[in-house]
Amino acid sequence: MIIKYNGDEKFEIKTTEAKVSLSSAGIDIEGFVISTPGEYERRGVSVQGLTLDGDQKPVYIIHTEEMTLCYPDGLNHELDEEIVKLIGDIDILFVPLGENGSMPLKLAQKFISDIDPRVVIPMLYSDIEQFKSAEGITDGEVDQLKIKKAELPVEERKFFILKSNN
């Protein structure tokens, strides 16, 4: 799978079977747009849209290439334990950072800790330095993330800061 960041809350994911776009409009699997809660499957990609605590936008759980991704666009509050269990085991977590419609640093750190993903990819940030410093991230930005299930970290969490292609 190849993940590219297109700025703000937008990502493009290329899998062996499909091109998937993530944005505030929802999940687009080659023209099949998912923007409401429910369970969907298209071209080897399954998506579960969860509505949490009356939020306007669903949190999306995406299963593809034997990996599970969580895309919580618009989430800006703490999750209770029951919701964290509902989200389940996540390999790759997209984290909305910042103040406007996303998560301040402390809330983002708690969200990451609660979900306990193997890989974290920040989004919606204007200044990433405070987050990098708080998490001890020394790696620079990368153009894209190319990853397979076998390459996921086992013992530690890995952070990837993707350069915006926009």
Which role fits each region the language model picked out?
Residues 104-109, 125-146:
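Enzymes that bind and transform nitrogen-containing heteroaromatic metabolites
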Residues 1-88, 92, 100-107, 142-166:
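Core dinuclear metal-dependent hydrolase active-site scaffold
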Residues 91-92, 99, 107-123:
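Proline-aspartate-enriched helix->loop->beta-strand connector
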Residues 25, 123-125:
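Short secondary-structure boundary segments
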